[in-house]
Amino acid sequence: HSMRYLSIIGTAICCVMLVMTSVSCKQETLSSTTQEKKVAPWYVYIDGSSFKDIEPVKEIISSISVFGNPPKSFIDECHQNHIEVYQAVGGNEETVDTPQKRKALVEKYVSDCNANGYDGIDLDLEHLSPDIQDAYTEFLKLASKELHAVGKKLSHCVSFYPALYQDNETKMFHDPAVLNTTCDLVRVMCYDMYFAPGIDKPELKHRDDCMGIGPTSNYLWTREAMLFWMKHIPNDKLVMALPAYANDYAVTGGIKGRQIYQSVPDSINGILPSPTWLCYEKVNMYLYDGCLLYTSDAADD
């Protein structure tokens, strides 16, 4: 990930809020006596972090995927509140390109889960070469087998790059059919439709999400992302990941972009907008140089 922080209470807690698609498609009534937990955020554990960060929203959180190294006491407290905890891990092509590396890595996953009490591993490997697909398939099969053997789960973050919108047969580094048979959860990252920090990076010019200026996401693109993955993964395994940040561009001179993780002052009176829990409604803001013109193509409702 490029770091995606969402400030829920005071300090930065979550990178992205996640909603089960199988829940979002249901008709729910206010009279329902059973409230199903629906939110599964990524959580960045840093110095000063504690379960107190999560306390205000613990009743709606089903699981968290943790970047960093929380103490076992933190994981235990999550379990006491019926929250599953995944260890978020990254990597690249060289991480899994030989049988020896794959075996050692999976052994480490199992060891970390058993030692710290994690409920599973959340794989966040992104933008790998499609040429690695065969090796990655073997990696997924091994990770799934060994984690499930000790009662742990396997989660995977997936994207919907613009190329998939144009060609559903685009080869990826992970085979969707293999993800379906090996993973317990598949988290669809409905963001980085445009990756603002990559707009001026020559080494990223080949990436679809760095070809031009645009929003982090929008509703129609998110819908297409979910529809694509629903063709490959059952709804009860899918998680819809929504961005808690916006793209910010300076477009005079050399174009540069960045990601912003908090509300910006009104350009006229300098006052921050009222806090809102609906962070997704503000994901499409832009900055046009010094004039501070912010726009959004998100729907009002």
Regions inferred by a protein language model and the residue ranges of each:
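Bacterial N-terminal signal peptides that target proteins for export
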Residues: 2-10
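Bacterial N-terminal signal peptides
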Residues: 11-21
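Bacterial Sec-dependent N-terminal signal peptides
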Residues: 21-36
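Chitinase-like catalytic core of GlcNAc-active glycosidases
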Residues: 35-214, 218
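Active-site region of glycoside hydrolase catalytic domains
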Residues: 187-188, 194, 220-253
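Gly/Pro-rich active-site loop or hairpin
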Residues: 198-227, 283, 288-296
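Glycan-binding loop/region signatures in secreted carbohydrate-active enzymes
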Residues: 237-296
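A short, hydrophobic C-terminal helix/tail in secreted or cell-surface proteins
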Residues: 297-301
